[in-house]
């Protein structure tokens, strides 16, 4: 149903970045709506009151009777659908939806939809750069950068969207041209009842998809629906007939499609097996929408990675320092430890800790024992990580990132790498993972 011809009333619940994009979208289409937020002073409140003074806004505890005035609630991803007021409104017949559902209704160009526990932003950025290199008018965003509704334009030829599990919870039918779940590992266990619930939320991305891309080495990435859809695969093993992978020739590894070498792995500017997997996933997604190989490979050769994502900072006294502050869950830390650990001559000194979000850290023990010389732990859940690691490596506990860098520099030997890959969120000590990464980078720069 067109929003313009509908006389139904909506409420935007949550006034952050995506909530404000909903406000702009609805206001520009003449839709009748109001706004609610659980916070007394949400981030975009001043902007709303300045630009849309006529819009009713309620801040503080959600009022169920107020919510039930609406036919539909557009719930921001930061607010759990299990929130009692939302559940009560839903039980009384109010539809729960979100910005991605609206985006899907109005997007006219093909959509590449990307989710996963890790590497979403890197792969999304890579595919966007590949599309630009191929001469496409492309819009990139969603959970990364620009909110989805702000990207809508008749001029766009291709959308490349990073989507979180929270965004997908309120998305019934995305209708992507190609969709992928890059990988699945425990994350946000403070919001989900367990891995199965998180898994189901991620897999909503496949609803209505015309093609899928699957990680051959992660069974949880395979669609629960859509048997018979065109399927492309990627993995760090030999490619299958519909897949991208690694081949070896004369002792050199190549990114490959089917049985054809595409480019030597050594030509990638980003290091580690996890970055090879990211490159292969991006190739599969680009190929699914017809991007030419020459443009995609040129983009791969120039890609230097994203800030706070296994980002090389400097070399000091024969030790390399990497900022992987974006590793806010165990799966992301595992990818960095295994990917970088297998790519250097020495050992890693790992810096980890923060808000674990209810995660199980036991999966860290084996790769840390294999690839790390020591682990320097800090933050709220440092002791939980220490218990999981046991006697696998030398453990050092500190109170600040600066102290962690100083201790790591003492522990590391020439040929080693110091890796900040926390396996935790940052909110116990920092505003966000970006601030944590900047503090780490500053501490590394101060080493002398």
From Swiss-Prot:
First-level EC class: ligase
Location(s) in or outside the cell: Cytoplasm
Catalysed reactions, semicolon-separated: UDP-N-acetyl-alpha-D-muramoyl-L-alanine + D-glutamate + ATP = UDP-N-acetyl-alpha-D-muramoyl-L-alanyl-D-glutamate + ADP + phosphate + H(+)
UniProt xrefs under Gene3D superfamilies: Mur ligase, C-terminal domain (3.90.190.20), Mur-like, catalytic domain (3.40.1190.10), NAD(P)-binding Rossmann-like Domain (3.40.50.720)
Keyword terms: ATP-binding, Cell cycle, Cell division, Cell shape, Cell wall biogenesis/degradation, Cytoplasm, Ligase, Nucleotide-binding, Peptidoglycan synthesis
Alphabetical list of SUPFAM superfamilies matching this protein: MurCD N-terminal domain, MurD-like peptide ligases, catalytic domain, MurD-like peptide ligases, peptide-binding domain
GO cellular component: cytoplasm
Signal peptide: none
EC number(s) stated in the UniProt entry for this protein: 6.3.2.9
Main location: cytoplasm
Record's keyword annotation contains Ligase: yes
Single biological process term from Gene Ontology: cell wall organization
Positions contributing to ATP binding: 116-122
Highest taxon, organism lineage: Bacteria
Pathway assigned in UniProt: Cell wall biogenesis; peptidoglycan biosynthesis
Any Pfam family the entry gives: Mur_ligase_C
Membrane-spanning intervals of the chain: none
HAMAP family linked: MurD (MF_00639)
Function: Cell wall formation. Catalyzes the addition of glutamate to the nucleotide precursor UDP-N-acetylmuramoyl-L-alanine (UMA).
Family to which this protein belongs: Belongs to the MurCDEF family.
Name of the featured protein: UDP-N-acetylmuramoylalanine--D-glutamate ligase
Species the sequence originates in: Pseudomonas savastanoi pv. phaseolicola (strain 1448A / Race 6)
Organism lineage string: Bacteria, Pseudomonadati, Pseudomonadota, Gammaproteobacteria, Pseudomonadales
This protein's encoding gene: murD
